[in-house]
A protein has these predicted regions:
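A generic secondary-structure signal
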Residues: 30-34, 74, 123-130
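C-terminal/domain-terminus segments
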Residues: 134-135, 139-141, 146-162
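A generic structural signal for short hydrophobic patches within well-formed alpha-helices
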Residues: 11, 49, 146-147
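Active-site neighborhoods of divalent-metal-dependent phosphate/nucleic-acid chemistry enzymes
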Residues: 81-145
């Protein structure tokens, strides 16, 4: 199984948000390719939904804002009803995970990396630690600081394979 955690930069291109959709065609082509790969699992974190919704709320043109909000509403409904190409990851953070995020807030803020991105990074870490049999995992993002989150996971060897 190969896991891609969807970042806000990707969802903004999927929804085609003005001024945040420079890679719309490329993202849509990759999304189609990922959907066709039966070994691929797409994960949509709550932070990605919230950040994307905030970007939609700040679209200057009211008609465009409404149009993109309608697309977002449909996307959320399809996600909840298991009709989207990804799986919703809405697990709330445990106390320890929030403490880990709190330790990184200042250093990341200095580098202009917000809590939304830290939350997505935490989803990456948690998913990697709790879901067995992952071949690879990455944060699917257009942001270079998040693209660095990619790992090939070592195969778990069964006793009879030794």
């Amino acid at each position: 199984m190969h896991v891609s955690i969807i970042d806000t930069s990707i969802l903004c291109n999927v929804i085609n948000i003005p001024n945040m959709n420079q890679n719309h065609k490329k993202v849509m082509e990759e999304l189609v390719a990922l959907q066709q790969n039966k070994l691929q699992t797409l994960i949509l974190p709550l932070a990605t939904i919230i950040e994307t919704g905030n970007h939609i709320a700040h679209i200057a043109d009211g008609n465009m804002r409404r149009a993109r909000a309608l697309v977002m509403a449909e996307l959320i409904q399809r996600t909840v009803n298991d009709q989207a190409p990804w799986t919703y990851y809405g697990k709330e953070f445990e106390r320890e995970e929030l403490l880990e995020i709190s330790k990184e807030v200042v250093d990341h803020a200095v580098r202009e990396i917000g809590i939304g991105d830290l939350s997505i990074i935490q989803v990456y870490k948690t998913y990697k630690e709790t879901v067995p049999a992952i071949g690879s995992i990455r944060i699917w993002s257009l942001d270079s600081h998040l693209q660095a989150y990619f790992e090939e996971m070592p195969a778990i060897r069964r006793r009879r394979d030794r």
